[in-house]
């Protein structure tokens, strides 16, 4: 196979060749062993940033050749893989951000390395995921839509067995948060591998994001944490990417270890999320949600600074608006709070 020879010679693939690569891996008629050979060779070579963009574009175009756009929308998510077993921070954040009037299209999955993935938590909360075709109406009515990654990209089921047979991480460990079916305006993306931060920030620029934050949490998490310096690459509206660190204590938040942020089963994480949204939780779990919500409010241009984002996120919780957003999503109330 020509692709195998190119990969053996460490030759960077073109967009057309990458599409062939994806088509091969997602073809159910090709046996898994042959797919393993190809993905193994791709994984052995150094993955270039351009190739990450090509892989993401190929997957999106395969499923959504006319990718829909929702102006002003944001997704807050992480790559997973940090093995921290934290509670569902980004899902909890999504309710708060949506309560600020920002359209949130959250792309999530079931648990892979944690006890409870985004979809697992939603099931426990009694909130259904939204079909891609129904997202515009869902956003219009409630301002927040949760999309199941497995439902929006069923072709990925043909790649899963291949990944399981390869012992090392592959490019598919980082593409999940990048293939939202909608062309987003903003994104906050947590990454477990700090060496991939700039690559992912550049890919988000290639995908047309107006603004984005790509971060690696202190001590290895794929969320901003309270335990030290969080590394950030920020894409601004001018297309510039800047690199800096943020520390929760600089914003008046108390230092806490990553272990203090651990969750549990979907049922246990449900109670954590509800306690935070209701304002009952005053612990570090609330603080880490406020910090991550602040980044989303900042990157989506709702506020001018991260500090202002922390103030607004706190108000959204304490005023009850975040809880109202949750109740709307569950169908408990229909009235909006302006």
Swiss-Prot record:
InterPro entries in the record: Anthranilate_Pribosyl_Tfrase, Glycosyl_Trfase_fam3, Nuc_phospho_transferase
Pathway: Amino-acid biosynthesis; L-tryptophan biosynthesis; L-tryptophan from chorismate: step 2/5
Residues where Mg(2+) 2 binds: 222-223
Binding site for anthranilate 1: 78, 109
A single Gene Ontology CC term: cytosol
Cofactor(s) required, per the database record: Mg(2+)
Binding site for 5-phospho-alpha-D-ribose 1-diphosphate: 78, 81-82, 86, 88-91, 106-114, 118
Residues engaged in binding Mg(2+) 1: 90, 223
The protein's Enzyme Commission number: 2.4.2.18
UniProt KW keywords: Amino-acid biosynthesis, Aromatic amino acid biosynthesis, Glycosyltransferase, Magnesium, Metal-binding, Transferase, Tryptophan biosynthesis
Pfam families, A to Z: Glycos_transf_3 (PF00591)
Entry's Gene Ontology molecular function annotations: anthranilate phosphoribosyltransferase activity; magnesium ion binding
Top class in the EC scheme: transferase
The record's free-text note on cofactor binding: Binds 2 magnesium ions per monomer.
GO biological process entries: L-tryptophan biosynthetic process
Gene3D superfamilies reported in the protein's UniProt record: Nucleoside phosphorylase/phosphoribosyltransferase catalytic domain, Transferase, Pyrimidine Nucleoside Phosphorylase, Chain C
Catalytic activity: N-(5-phospho-beta-D-ribosyl)anthranilate + diphosphate = 5-phospho-alpha-D-ribose 1-diphosphate + anthranilate
Chain residues that bind anthranilate 2: 163
Primary role: Catalyzes the transfer of the phosphoribosyl group of 5-phosphorylribose-1-pyrophosphate (PRPP) to anthranilate to yield N-(5'-phosphoribosyl)-anthranilate (PRA).
Matching NCBIfam families: trpD
UniProt subunit comment: Homodimer.
Family stated for the protein in its record: Belongs to the anthranilate phosphoribosyltransferase family.
Name of the protein: Anthranilate phosphoribosyltransferase
Organism listed in the record: Staphylococcus haemolyticus (strain JCSC1435)
